[in-house]
Amino acid sequence: MNLIAKLEQEEIERALAGKTIPEFAPGDTVIVNVNVVEGNRKRVQAYEGVVIAKRNRGLNSSFIVRKISSGEGVERTFQTYSPLLASIVVKRRGDVRRAKLYYLRERSGKSARIKEKLVSKDRAAAASQE
């Protein structure tokens, strides 16, 4: 492993200190809690939506979350290892066949729905034991 890769790995470990980022994929509905600083106040803002893209580039990894806010589509890009991310919670697993769900931008209503991924009983039992 070269020097830059080692430095990036150290930065990732430092950014993850005390935090765990769950496994999630495009199509999943997630709640991203973001630390927001307004003047001298600090608060946590929740942003819930569907992951439409995930970019795995080491320290530069990011993901895009799309939600509908008062009838208007809103997309927000988050850096995976940002210190501003308080936590990520996977609310629902989506069953999709694409890595990038940009086609959801043109869709609205029922055509923009995503099927829920069903987990077999064997895997559910194994996951609950861990």
Curated annotation (Swiss-Prot):
Molecular function terms from GO:
structural constituent of ribosome
- GO terms for CC? cytosolic large ribosomal subunit
Keyword Ribonucleoprotein in the entry? The reply is yes
Domain of life where this protein originates:
Bacteria
Describe the function of this protein: This protein is located at the 30S-50S ribosomal subunit interface and may play a role in the structure and function of the aminoacyl-tRNA binding site.
InterPro entries (UniProt xref): Ribosomal_bL19, Ribosomal_bL19_CS, Ribosomal_bL19_sf, Translation_prot_SH3-like_sf
Where does the sequence pass through the membrane?
A: none
Name a biological process GO annotation: translation
Its family remark reads: Belongs to the bacterial ribosomal protein bL19 family.
Question: Is Oxidoreductase among the key words of this record?
Answer: no
Source organism per UniProt? Burkholderia multivorans (strain ATCC 17616 / 249)
Keyword terms of this UniProt record: Ribonucleoprotein, Ribosomal protein
Protein's name according to its UniProt entry: Large ribosomal subunit protein bL19
User: Gene name, please?
Assistant: rplS
